[in-house]
C-alpha cells in the first residue's frame, strides 16, 4: 500500500529552512505513530509531500485512520503505483479502476505531474477524460462540481491512481512549537483546548488538580490518554496529578465566600506554574471562555494571571459553549465530559465577577501557603503511556442506599455554608456535620463499630469520598441518596 501525504498549507509558505525542519519533524512523527501498527513501514520525505509505503495490506484501514489523526497533514491520498508507457496506457489503467465508480455519474479528470514529460497535465486530462466519456456511455463530463473527481498523479515514469482522498487534522506537526502544560479537568473545555494546542504543534503535558478520590482521577486520566493516543502519540508526555483537597479545605475555612473562586484559580495557576518550571514547560493552557462563569471575566482573569510570570494560553476565550461541545463531539471527548463529575461544595454561593486585587490579596494572607507548597512537592508524575495499564485495574466500588438502617450515622460532608443554608434533618438517625475536606483526617477518630453513610447534594463528592475511604481500608461506609 502507498499513501501520499500532503502538507498543511501554512507549512508550504515558510522559509526553506523552516519548511524543511517542519517536514523532517512531521516525517518522524508519522514513523513514531505507524511503527507500533505495521512492520517495515517506509516513510520518505519530499519537498512538497511525504510518501508512506507498507507491505501489510490487511492493515491498510488502520494506517489510513492513524494518518488522518496526525497534526500537520492537510490530506492523504491513497494511491496505486504503476508504471506506464504513454497517455493511452494511462487512460486504460484509469478506465479499469474507475469504470464502476463513474456509471451514471458526472465526472472530471484532474492531473498533477512531477518530472519531465512529453505531454502537459491538461493534455492528459483531455485525453483520459475523453476516453472515459466514450467508453462509459452513462457517464457525463462536468468540469464544475462533478459527482466524481478522477485524480491522477504522474511522477516521472510512474502513474499514481488515487483510490481515495482523506482529510487530515491540518495544523503544525507536534514538536515544531514548544511544550505546554494543560490544566485538565476532564470536562468539555479542557479537552478541546488541549486538542487545539496539539493541533498547533505543541507537545501537551497534563496537570490535574484532584479534589477527591481515585474515581475522578481515573476518569481524567482516561480523557488525557485518549487525547494523547488519538492525536499526540508521536511524543512522550507527562501526566501530573496534584491532590488539591487540602488547598480547597483551607480556602473554605479561611477565605471569604465571594472571593473563593478567584483565589482557587490563583492557587491552581501558582501550582501549575511551579510544575511547568520544574519540567521546562513554557506555557499553561486552560479551557476558560470569556464570561462563561464568574471567575472568567476580564477583571478576574487578569488577577488570576497576575500570580505567575508563566504565559497562560486560553484558546477557547471567544468560543461559546455550544461550539465547544460541538468540537468535543468531533474529537471524541464529548462522552467523557458528559459523565465527568462536578463537585458540590467547592463553588462559592455569591462569587464576585469583578474582584479587587487588594481584597483578594488580603484574603490570601489568611491562607497557609505551606499547604500549597506541600501538595506541589507531593505531586505524582507519570508517563501517560502507563495510564492504559493502570486504568485496567479494578476500581473499588461502594454501595449507594436510598433508606437508612437502624444505627446508621449520616455524615453530612457538605461545606459549612451549605449545611447552614439547607440543614439535613433526619428524625430517626444521627447526623454528624463533617465537611469533605476534613473527612480523610477525622474519619479514623470515629467509632468504627458504627456504619457511616455519606451525604451531599448531588451525590458526587460523597461517592468519591466513600471510594477514598474504602481504598484506605474502611468497609463501614456507604453513600446516602434519598
From Swiss-Prot:
GO terms for molecular function: ATP binding; CCA tRNA nucleotidyltransferase activity; tRNA binding; tRNA-uracil-4 sulfurtransferase activity. It is found in: Cytoplasm. Pathway: Cofactor biosynthesis; thiamine diphosphate biosynthesis. It is an enzyme of class 2 (transferase). GO terms for cellular component: cytosol. Pfam families: ThiI, ThiI_fer, THUMP. Residues 61-165 form the THUMP domain. PROSITE patterns: RHODANESE_3 (PS50206), THUMP (PS51165). InterPro entries: Rhodanese-like_dom (IPR001763), Rhodanese-like_dom_sf (IPR036873), Rossmann-like_a/b/a_fold (IPR014729), ThiI_AANH (IPR020536), ThiI_fer (IPR054173), ThiI_N (IPR049961), THII_Thiazole_biosynth_dom (IPR026340), THUMP_dom (IPR004114). One of its GO terms (biological process) is thiamine biosynthetic process. It catalyses: [ThiI sulfur-carrier protein]-S-sulfanyl-L-cysteine + a uridine in tRNA + 2 reduced [2Fe-2S]-[ferredoxin] + ATP + H(+) = [ThiI sulfur-carrier protein]-L-cysteine + a 4-thiouridine in tRNA + 2 oxidized [2Fe-2S]-[ferredoxin] + AMP + diphosphate; [ThiS sulfur-carrier protein]-C-terminal Gly-Gly-AMP + S-sulfanyl-L-cysteinyl-[cysteine desulfurase] + AH2 = [ThiS sulfur-carrier protein]-C-terminal-Gly-aminoethanethioate + L-cysteinyl-[cysteine desulfurase] + A + AMP + 2 H(+). The active site is at 456 (cysteine persulfide intermediate). Transmembrane segments: none annotated. Residues 404-482 form the Rhodanese domain. It comes from the Bacteria. ATP binds at residues 183-184, 265, 287, 296. CDD domains: PPase_ThiI, RHOD, THUMP_ThiI. Its EC number is 2.8.1.4. Keywords: ATP-binding, Cytoplasm, Disulfide bond, Nucleotide-binding, Redox-active center, RNA-binding, Thiamine biosynthesis, Transferase, tRNA-binding. Disulfide bonds join 344-456. Catalyzes the ATP-dependent transfer of a sulfur to tRNA to produce 4-thiouridine in position 8 of tRNAs, which functions as a near-UV photosensor. Also catalyzes the transfer of sulfur to the sulfur carrier protein ThiS, forming ThiS-thiocarboxylate. This is a step in the synthesis of thiazole, in the thiamine biosynthesis pathway. The sulfur is donated as persulfide by IscS. Belongs to the ThiI family. This is tRNA sulfurtransferase. It comes from Edwardsiella ictaluri (strain 93-146). The gene is thiI.
